[in-house]
Amino acid sequence: MGGAIGMTERNGTFVLGLGAQKAGSSWLHAQLNRRRDAEFGFLKEYHIHDALTLPEAGFSNRRQRSLIKPRTWRRQRFIAQPQRYFDYFASLLRRPGIQLTGDITPSYSALKPETLRKIQAGFAEREIPIRPIFLMRDPIERIISYQRMQLRKQNQLNRKTEVEALRQLCIERPVRVMLRSDYGHTLMALTEVFEPNECFIDLYERLFTPASWKHLCDVLKVPYEEPDWGQQVNVSRTDTSIPDEILAELGDWQAPTMAAVRQTMGHLDLAQLWPLAHRWCTDFS
């Protein structure tokens, strides 16, 4: 467990963003990438390690997509030759004044410990410290926000379709959603591979505060810079009232996730921070 000996912030820092999906990762990327000492490259979500190791996440088929777009072509080279991925970010950190780079891909939350070790080793070979970031959101709120995003993309967002889509989601419990909701797995994997002081693990509901942002900057070994608190990125809001029976189904589905967070971060007041999950995730066994 832990990083390679002898690496210091003089080499810069690589941020490995592991989500969770719909838990502030787009806002996080926007704030970090706007720093003068940061360069996150040509994508926010590179989807390399999930494409290579998590076919169930649905990103492996991107290998077959058109190579006409430069971004797609460059990404294919990373997948075909993963060493290029590490070399690319190392090259960004060699630019004058750049101390921070990274890949913030929410589906990385499902990566296995052995994959995290390989990522860690790839940057250790280049003497670059890696700092994982994992943000968790009220699991019921997160799924509701995810479903709204999907319906909005399809131009089908209204009260009736939202309620019915959530009802169907509770019945099907698809793997792609479960992968991104398993906070317990991500916490376990991070604990197995990294030292506690190498990780920034917090809640979406606490992210937008000076104290949380200062802690993040400390973990990343960069000076504190005030983010744009008012910037909104990929916000999913409606006035739809979700029926209690669906909230109960979501609570039953997400109870193991809630239990894992309580066990790991029991010092937090989840009744106040995650009111929906606290009310509806009643079976923590």
Q: Which role does the model predict for each range below?
A:
Residues 82-89, 116, 120, 187-188, ...:
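Generic structural signal for well-ordered alpha-helices
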